[in-house]
Regions:
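Conserved short secondary-structure elements within globular domains
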Residues: 170
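ATP-dependent carboxylate/acyl-activation modules
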Residues: 148-149, 153-157, 161, 173-200
Length: 200
């Protein structure tokens, strides 16, 4: 896991253009790499469990009632599966290194989201950062929501997806700010009570 500043040194092709743009504006944040999410899935055998769960679904003729039940079970499976202790400690250290445990203030808000997407999960964090980790898992679980799975079935004929980066940013979910976007020469900018938090 890397701070935005560290991640930007690796280049947009490795960490995404939004992270590089945020780092250039000195936005504090952290990138949870796709490898971390992938390791979580594999460590608790989620690909096989999810494959068995969705086996009854025919992508050419989706029973939406059955799919709705299965997606609720899949979301619960992600939320209730545990990360390995080493992974948890790595996350906590990285969160602290990024200044997102707010140890100097006794706590603070963060939101987690995917690059380029406004929808997020929020948490009130105190050291070591358990609430932030739970928000990350809720975001990962949202990939298995009914609408998200239905879109994947329509577009790809399957329910699977690749791991993607997750961003952890200070404050609550941002909102579009056209004035900030214009000042930065961007089409869109998101801000919250801490300042700039998104340049998709």
């Amino acid at each position: 896991m890397l701070t935005f500043e560290e991640a930007a040194r690796r280049g947009a092709d490795r960490v995404g253009a939004e992270v590089v743009r945020l780092a250039a504006q000195d936005v504090r944040g952290m990138v949870v790499p796709p490898e971390f999410e992938d390791a979580f899935y594999r460590s608790v055998n989620l690909p096989e469990q999810l494959g068995r769960l969705f086996a009854p679904i025919n992508p050419r003729r989706v029973d939406e009632d059955a799919l709705e039940d299965l997606t609720a079970r899949a979301e619960a499976l992600i939320r209730t599966s545990f990360l390995m202790d080493d992974a948890v400690q790595i996350f906590y250290r990285a969160l602290g290194n990024a200044g997102l445990t707010f140890a100097d203030r006794g706590g603070g808000a963060v939101h987690v989201r995917r690059p380029g997407h406004l929808s997020s999960e929020e948490a009130q964090v105190t050291p070591p950062g358990m609430a932030a980790l739970q928000a990350v898992k809720r975001l990962w679980a949202s990939d298995w929501a009914f609408g998200a799975v239905l879109v994947r079935l329509d577009e790809t004929g399957g329910v699977g997806l690749d791991a993607r980066p997750t961003l952890v940013l200070p404050g609550l979910t941002g909102t579009p700010d056209p004035v900030m976007a214009e000042a930065l020469g961007m089409g869109t900018a998101w801000v919250n009570e801490t300042g700039l938090v998104g340049l998709p």
